[in-house]
Amino acid sequence: MFARKQSGAAPFGAMPVPDQPPSASEKNSSLSPGLNTSNGDGSETETTSAILASVKEQELQFERLTRELEAERQIVASQLERCKLGSETGSMSSISSAGEQFHWQTQDGQKDIEDELTTGLELVDSCIRSLQESGILDPQDYSTSERPSLLSQSALQLNSKPEGSFQYPASYHSNQTLALGDTAPSQLPARSTQARAAGQSFSQGTTGRAGHLAGSEPAPPPPPPREPFAPSLGSAFHLPDAPPAAAALYYSSSTLPAPPRGGSPLTTTQGGSPTKLQRGGSAPEGAAYAAPRGSSPKQSPSRLAKSYSTSSPINIVVSSAGLSPIRVTSPPTVQSTISSSPIHQLSSTIGTYATLSPTKRLVHASEQYSKHSQELYATATLQRPGSLAAGSRASYSSQHGHLAPELRALQSPEHHIDPIYEDRVYQKPPMRSLSQSQGDPLPPAHTGTFRTSTAPSSPGVDSVPLQRTGSQHGPQNAAAATFQRASYAAGPASNYADPYRQLQYCASVDSPYSKSGPALPPEGTLARSPSIDSIQKDPREFGWRDPELPEVIQMLQHQFPSVQSNAAAYLQHLCFGDNKIKAEIRRQGGIQLLVDLLDHRMTEVHRSACGALRNLVYGKANDDNKIALKNCGGIPALVRLLRKTTDLEIRELVTGVLWNLSSCDALKMPIIQDALAVLTNAVIIPHSGWENSPLQDDRKIQLHSSQVLRNATGCLRNVSSAGEEARRRMRECDGLTDALLYVIQSALGSSEIDSKTVENCVCILRNLSYRLAAETSQGQHMGTDELDGLLCGETNGKDTESSGCWGKKKKKKKSQDQWDGVGPLPDCAEPPKGIQMLWHPSIVKPYLTLLSECSNPDTLEGAAGALQNLAAGSWKGWAEDVAGMAYALRSLPEGAPCLPQWSVYIRAAVRKEKGLPILVELLRIDNDRVVCAVATALRNMALDVRNKELIGKYAMRDLVHRLPGGNNSNNSGSKAMSDDTVTAVCCTLHEVITKNMENAKALRDAGGIEKLVGISKSKGDKHSPKVVKAASQVLNSMWQYRDLRSLYKKDGWSQYHFVASSSTIERDRQRPYSSSRTPSISPVRVSPNNRSASAPASPREMISLKERKTDYESAGNNATYHGTKGEHTSRKDTMTAQNTGVSTLYRNSYGAPAEDIKQNQVSTQPVPQEPSRKDYETYQPFPNSTRNYDESFFEDQVHHRPPASEYTMHLGLKSTGNYVDFYSAARPYSELNYETSHYPASPDSWV
């Protein structure tokens, strides 16, 4: 505060003023931060005149603003174009220049201004009426006709200066209004003087020091504080230890032009006339406002105060900066003082209606700017579109032109603005409460539309401008945290209300302008958008157009990383669910640019580029995009990024892109070649926990829940069906098989057993188990003893006692080679590792545990299919084909050891682990594909004599129940079974009754004949030919048991029912062999009573098979479900959709909040432009974006079934075509020949 002037002193070089009485002077100095001037007599008439002059000035200002509204709207549009994001220089300086004029009002704000003007006029009329009724104001001095010109002067004077600078209605010190007390009757004269000084400039950072500094007169020491004000100070003010060195900051008037720097803003005259206060430059002609002494009856200060406080609803804030239309807030401790301060009440309410810039610059010392510039910029540069750069720059240049260059640089808007195009999108720090920053609790808020509170002053507190503190305290009190608007120089801060903020800021409600906060408050509560980030604007204030697609693609090459990142994120948003946009992006070269960004140095750019690529390559309809990405070098670029990045989100995105790419058949081998090693070593092994097996259980579960692991296993699941070469490379990849099995084993007994990761691992192992004997060196090498037994054994076929399910073998070898499931495995000296784990019997237990505990149908199908593949045939020393056998004969040294019969061991291990009841129980599950896989697995298990007996005894009714037709109650449910499943059940029944009359009798007892006859006699399209012929084969085999024919006839069946379809089969049998056709089936040639399906072949048959080897190979390839020409067939997909409701195309959310990657299309990507669209499960390109990106559902087009070949039986030596070949939809039934059943071993079913 300023000390009282000495008697006769002439402040600022003006005429001397009479001395005030000590009491009045002391009160003035304690209550006013403005100039300590007074008219000597304290006349009430001058007070009234001052009030009237100020009110008229306000009305004139409002009137002028009303006239300029229309013109301003037209200019705003042109000014907004300068704020575009793609300015040539990329900086705020390119938006506009200081010489241009700016208008604030936009069309959206017109109605608010007009409402404010109307309300302001009503309140002014009420104030005038109160003055007239109290006798203070002469009715002739004011009339309603004068009202239109009365309000204009207090409004903003925009574009009134040739230099184009903004003139604000008051300096920010006008916020530091002091509360008047009822004990200060003589303060009104001084306040009237201050009211007329509203437009003066202050050349010092403090309100009251302007006069002293301009006149080079040192400021007297502040007087001691007064008691009455001490309680109301709270923690809002403190006395600095020393005046700040950089306090000489200049601020021009916000309402009127700046006066000459060396002159006095106020000139006080005497000499027979009332004291007259002139505003320097208050009008272009420099007119002065005089307040005649006799303009109204003389009133006492107390009467004046009473009349204002009781009759007028208007609150006036009078401060050292004049009548300022700025609402201010103070701690509630001064609330009682405010209610008794009439002048405060009047001007503060009028100020509420005025339109002013929300740009409250916070000026600090240079060291504080360097420390808090970002925070200041976030809260201080809240301005209108036109003022984004040029207005604030012009105001600074006019207001701070006298500063030193270093200080001027600190004041410049460019000093505050964080680079828009740098590494990140700017986020405003939250506002902080002053009282909290000082350690005091925030006082409760006071509600009310026109709530006005002021920060009290004290004679003992120097009225230097308040400073925003740099405190980083926690969130504000939810009850009443108001925004701070600190003043310019160093010193304490107080709480001020944001003039454009009606709501209280609290921890539970984020800022309406926050990029990631909740929805915006209602329209009525917000009038301005304070955002200075040109990337995102308040949609109510700024009508930005969406950029065109070529513009967005061009921005991918921008020099600033943040522009590239935002452009990629916007592309991700645009192509969400829109295949046309995806194709257009490809045509315009967007994929190449996005791939180039994968090698960028900025992590944020990687994140956005991967998100966009993931959406672009999602879906089978976008295979062209996938191939384009591959042609652009995208797969190696993704692998490089995966290898070097440590960001978990980016790793998830990269593996998600690879998962989507892997659904394209043409890209499976390129992914195997470029990404298999990195996926295994950088993702699968580390995230599985296999290398660190002693991990804690919770750690294991966390790893198995990893999105990165899920994506990587999904990718490998797809590529594992790419053919023999792909399977070979994956089997030989060190650590892959071990890690996949470890994931499965560690998930057993936990909730993770149904997870997508476990499902993927099981499906990979199932595919790798396909054709294991033929595609591994172990299956292609055999001992000479086994070959001798195969080729030189007894050929008469009469020694049926020595033949069994595994074919004819030498008696001396039988005991050595077979394992009954009890005791240790023969020929197993060391524990299995690597590829050996695929076929070792120890793998049976994890598979069976999955089958008994898991509820995921895809996992169940995968585990059953893996057992089916492993149990197919006896491939221990047998070659898959004649070529392999011949190779073995030539390459194996004499006396080479034979390999164990792993398929025999697998079947025995399933029985030992009580797996047969588990498989039979799954026949009852209501899932077509699971039933199909389980039925085929049971068929392969029945190759074991003991298993066949158990299945015939305990599973026959379940198998028959799955056949369509008959009178069973679930007939409708059975009809829903697919042809593949019905065929699998028929093949299982055929294997079970082969060479087992008891099982054939059990089939008759279970009512199977009726259903089988119904299928074989069906006409039309009720059943496919494949199903009809499979059922006929079972009936033909049953008729071979002569002992059971009497029972059949007793039940009313005749030979016609059993062999009615044999004529067709006979024709196929009699058809000569050709190089283009495989042998057909003839159930008549060999009776199942005399010949087992797994009986050994004679040398003659071996030679004939050698000639047909090539035919089997080609037929098998054509029949494969996962063939080189495509892994999904429309038939298979249709079957899946109709019968299980589950598509082979899995859409996994990627990190999105929904399963679209949403398991989230994860919303991902939300884009600020469309906040309502929630997509990017997971991932927000912008701080406020909802994640709605197309988070491409990773299409697990992993054939839930092993590759086509997996389901196709292994043809060749061990194929019993009568079972296996039925599974091939591509091969006509007539091409199958029953002769193949004579060869030992049983092929894998194709399921």
Swiss-Prot record:
ARM repeats lie at residues 391-433, 537-576, 579-618, 623-663, 679-721, 725-770, 832-872, 904-943, 997-1040. O-glycosylated. One of its GO terms (biological process) is regulation of synaptic plasticity. The modification Phosphoserine is found at residues 7, 264, 273, 324, 357, 412, 458, 511, 1087, 1098. GO terms for cellular component: adherens junction; dendrite; nucleus; perikaryon; postsynaptic density. Residues 49-84 form a coiled coil. Induction: By retinoic acid. Has a critical role in neuronal development, particularly in the formation and/or maintenance of dendritic spines and synapses. Involved in the regulation of canonical Wnt signaling. It probably acts on beta-catenin turnover, facilitating beta-catenin interaction with GSK3B, phosphorylation, ubiquitination and degradation. May be involved in neuronal cell adhesion and tissue morphogenesis and integrity by regulating adhesion molecules. Functions as a transcriptional activator when bound to ZBTB33. This is Catenin delta-2. It comes from Mus musculus.
